[in-house]
């Protein structure tokens, strides 16, 4: 099934004929298969591991270094993330480079005009399926300084670092704050700990600083989150392993504690699949007596999922908006 963005692109198939093509940005479907027959070559790059891991021909990472005669960028809802990815890629190509930018109107794709106007000619060439399609030709190669995109803030004795579109990138959110308040020195936490959906690394770094003897693993699907967590650990002189994983897809070991402020937003829609998989599979990923501890908006239907997977659960902290759940293997 094609996304709305790709449906619009199918109206312009002649543009892809006999050219090397790069698809990157928020690619979520197999539009590549639609154009392979007539294109010279098709490459796909994604910063989202949940998508990239499904297909052998999709490259995953933070920096896209793939060159092509025509690039197609799928706009994301986060303007700064788009700016980061577009300028990073355009900084390494030549004047005359052609690009198409496609995105939903509700995701703010219109702002690409102001973003790219300083670097070349941009024009809207189609509007359909509540999306806008733009053609861009590079006239002035931009300078890309990734350091300018980093945000940081102080959390007690920690410095937290984050790239665009990473959760808790500007300040500590209320849910994570409540979750962290449930840990104290008296717990004497030890063993293997997994911070799943680590974002900027707030939870994992906080626990590692508080409980030095734990063996910490941090995981996320977003390349920007993984880089942010690595940076947070390094800048605070903390040890930990950071891995790309779609829930447990790339994690084989068992843990004594799995802790998470799991996401329930997917782009500009709400999605629960990752959380459902986390709760359903966590018991098999815990050592005997191990614990799953998560925080969530109070209205979300997690108690039933926890009881189904673990047999029971406890609410160990709550506020007007959030609840912290604990379930033990």
From Swiss-Prot:
Catalytic reaction list: guanosine(1207) in 16S rRNA + S-adenosyl-L-methionine = N(2)-methylguanosine(1207) in 16S rRNA + S-adenosyl-L-homocysteine + H(+)
Primary location: cytoplasm
Keyword field contains Transferase: yes
Record localization: Cytoplasm
GO cellular component labels: cytoplasm
Entry's EC annotation: 2.1.1.172
InterPro entries: DNA_methylase_N6_adenine_CS, Mtase_sm_N, rRNA_ssu_MeTfrase_C, RsmC/RlmG, SAM-dependent_MTases_sf, Small_mtfrase_dom
NCBIfam families xrefs: PRK09489.1
UniProt cross-references to HAMAP family, sorted A to Z: 16SrRNA_methyltr_C
Similarity annotation: Belongs to the methyltransferase superfamily. RsmC family.
Function: Specifically methylates the guanine in position 1207 of 16S rRNA in the 30S particle.
Name of the protein in its database record: Ribosomal RNA small subunit methyltransferase C
Protein source organism: Actinobacillus pleuropneumoniae serotype 3 (strain JL03)
């Amino acid at each position: 099934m094609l996304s709305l963005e790709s449906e619009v692109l199918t109206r312009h198939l002649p543009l892809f004929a006999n050219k090397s093509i790069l698809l990157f940005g928020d690619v979520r479907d197999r539009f590549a298969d639609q154009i392979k027959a007539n294109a010279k070559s098709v490459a796909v790059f994604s910063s989202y591991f949940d998508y990239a891991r499904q297909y052998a021909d999709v490259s995953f990472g933070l920096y896209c270094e793939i060159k092509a005669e025509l690039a197609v960028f799928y706009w994301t809802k986060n303007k700064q993330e788009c700016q980061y990815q577009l300028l990073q890629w355009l900084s390494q190509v030549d004047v005359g480079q052609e690009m198409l930018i496609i995105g939903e109107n509700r995701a703010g794709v219109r702002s690409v005009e102001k973003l790219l106007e300083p670097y070349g000619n941009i024009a809207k060439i189609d509007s359909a399926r509540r999306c806008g399609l733009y053609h861009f030709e590079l006239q002035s190669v931009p300078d890309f300084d990734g350091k300018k995109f980093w945000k940081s803030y102080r959390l007690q004795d920690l410095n937290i670092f984050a790239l665009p579109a990473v959760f808790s990138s500007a300040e500590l959110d209320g849910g994570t704050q409540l979750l962290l308040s449930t840990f104290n020195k008296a717990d004497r936490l030890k063993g293997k700990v997994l911070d799943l959906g680590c974002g900027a690394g707030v939870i994992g770094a906080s626990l590692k600083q508080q409980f030095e003897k734990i063996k910490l693993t941090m995981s996320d699907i977003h390349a920007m989150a993984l880089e942010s967590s690595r940076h947070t650990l390094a800048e605070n002189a903390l040890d930990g392993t950071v891995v790309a994983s779609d829930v447990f897809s790339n994690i084989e070991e068992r843990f004594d504690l799995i802790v998470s402020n799991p996401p329930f937003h997917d782009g500009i829609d709400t999605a629960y699949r990752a959380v459902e998989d986390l709760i359903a599979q966590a018991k098999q990923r815990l050592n005997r007596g191990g614990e799953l501890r998560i925080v969530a908006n109070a209205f979300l239907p997690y108690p039933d999922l926890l009881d189904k997977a673990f047999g029971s659960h406890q609410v160990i902290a709550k506020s007007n908006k959030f609840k912290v759940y604990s379930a033990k293997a």
